[in-house]
């Protein structure tokens, strides 16, 4: 939210439009580059934690260890991207770095609170991508259709809404 908000605030996107790039090119490049950067940053901590614990406790089955790491990486990228796209949507609507960062933080904090208390109070939490990550890493099977569906629905809706708003933004 911070970086994309700065691009709106500092009118970087306006310069890209003025340079002759289409909105589709700009939007697609922003989404792809930010999702790659976000997922790389989001995976550093879990992967380093696995390596640290591997060194400390060892692993009984190396194949299963790497199977679980690959599964966690793939599903984390899909489901964390769905959460990160909230920031993209908010930035497209607010077009201000401070407002977008604040609103995004509040929304994600609210979703985290709902996940924590929702699980305790037995509220429906299966629609949350963060909950699906928890389910996927605790299951033995690799293919988790519900997690894939949740990630794709969240991502699809958020990208569509972001694109619609991005097309309506006034760039001069």
What residue ranges belong to the model's regions?
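Hydrophobic/aromatic residues in alpha-helical transmembrane segments
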Residues: 1, 13, 85-86, 129, ...
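Membrane-interfacial segments
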Residues: 8, 12, 52-60, 94, ...
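Helix-loop-helix units of permease transmembrane domains in multi-pass membrane transporters
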Residues: 3-35
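Terminal transmembrane helical anchor/hairpin motif
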Residues: 60, 101-172
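Secretory targeting signals
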Residues: 1-3, 27-98, 134-149
């Amino acid at each position: 939210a911070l970086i994309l908000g700065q691009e709106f605030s500092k009118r970087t996107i306006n310069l890209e439009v003025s340079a002759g790039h289409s909105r589709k090119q700009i939007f697609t490049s922003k989404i792809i580059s930010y999702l790659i950067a976000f997922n790389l940053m989001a995976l550093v901590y879990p992967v380093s934690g696995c390596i640290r614990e591997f060194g400390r406790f060892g692993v009984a089955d190396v194949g299963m260890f790497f199977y679980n790491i690959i599964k966690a990486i793939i599903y984390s990228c899909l489901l964390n991207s769905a959460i990160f796209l909230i920031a993209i949507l908010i930035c497209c609507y607010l077009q201000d770095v401070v407002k977008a960062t604040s609103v995004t933080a509040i929304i994600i904090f609210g979703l985290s609170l709902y996940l924590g208390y929702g699980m305790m109070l037995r509220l429906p939490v299966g629609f949350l991508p963060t909950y699906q990550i928890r389910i996927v890493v605790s299951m033995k099977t690799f293919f988790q259709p519900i997690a894939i569906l949740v990630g794709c629905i969240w991502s699809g809706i958020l990208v569509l809404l972001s694109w619609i708003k991005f097309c309506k933004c006034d760039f001069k």
